[in-house]
């Protein structure tokens, strides 16, 4: 799966929100179970396809992704899991949507701090030098 981390993070946030909604509507549904094995339905698909972030950073997902494709994408995210070096030691619990979202959130912060902000700073300094 070659998807930007910010798009993956958004997808996980939308999935989490949907699981919470389902658990609140139907008290017989256990939220912890949904977090380990989330329900991916048309509501998640529509939210994902129409989100501005997806339109900007992953326009191919706005056009081409079906419900089956979105389910496969989420399954792949769960299958990839969290790298061992990023997990807390001794954690043998099944990975949840929250765990994955936290991991991708930290990954995105690192991308911003180590890549995008320095590039932006360099571009601003270059522009400023040309103005002087």
Curated annotation (Swiss-Prot):
<dbReference type="InterPro" id="IPR020195">
    <property type="entry name" value="SWR1_Swc7"/>
</dbReference>
<keyword id="KW-0539">Nucleus</keyword>
<protein>
    <recommendedName>
        <fullName>SWR1-complex protein 7</fullName>
    </recommendedName>
</protein>
<comment type="subunit">
    <text>Component of the SWR1 chromatin remodeling complex composed of at least ACT1, ARP4, RVB1, RVB2, ARP6, YAF9, VPS71, VPS72, SWC3, SWC4, SWC5, SWC7 and SWR1, and perhaps BDF1.</text>
</comment>
<keyword id="KW-0805">Transcription regulation</keyword>
<dbReference type="Pfam" id="PF17330">
    <property type="entry name" value="SWC7"/>
</dbReference>
<keyword id="KW-0010">Activator</keyword>
<dbReference type="GO" id="GO:0006338">
    <property type="term" value="P:chromatin remodeling"/>
</dbReference>
<dbReference type="GO" id="GO:0000812">
    <property type="term" value="C:Swr1 complex"/>
</dbReference>
<comment type="function">
    <text>Component of the SWR1 complex which mediates the ATP-dependent exchange of histone H2A for the H2A variant HZT1 leading to transcriptional regulation of selected genes by chromatin remodeling.</text>
</comment>
<dbReference type="GO" id="GO:0005634">
    <property type="term" value="C:nucleus"/>
</dbReference>
<keyword id="KW-0156">Chromatin regulator</keyword>
<dbReference type="GO" id="GO:0006355">
    <property type="term" value="P:regulation of DNA-templated transcription"/>
</dbReference>
<dbReference type="GO" id="GO:0000785">
    <property type="term" value="C:chromatin"/>
</dbReference>
<comment type="similarity">
    <text>Belongs to the SWC7 family.</text>
</comment>
<keyword id="KW-0804">Transcription</keyword>
């Amino acid at each position: 799966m070659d998807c930007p981390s910010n798009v993956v993070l958004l997808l996980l946030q939308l999935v989490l929100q949907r699981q919470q909604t389902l658990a609140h509507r139907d008290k017989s549904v256990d939220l912890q179970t949904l977090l380990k094995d989330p329900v991916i339905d048309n509501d998640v698909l529509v939210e994902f396809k129409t989100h501005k972030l997806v339109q900007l950073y992953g326009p191919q997902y706005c056009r081409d992704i079906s419900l089956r494709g979105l389910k496969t994408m989420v399954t792949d995210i769960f299958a990839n899991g969290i790298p061992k070096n990023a997990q807390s030691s001794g954690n043998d619990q099944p990975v949840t949507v929250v765990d994955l979202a936290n991991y991708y959130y930290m990954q995105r912060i690192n991308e911003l701090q180590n890549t995008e902000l320095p590039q932006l700073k360099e571009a601003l300094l270059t522009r400023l030098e040309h103005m002087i």
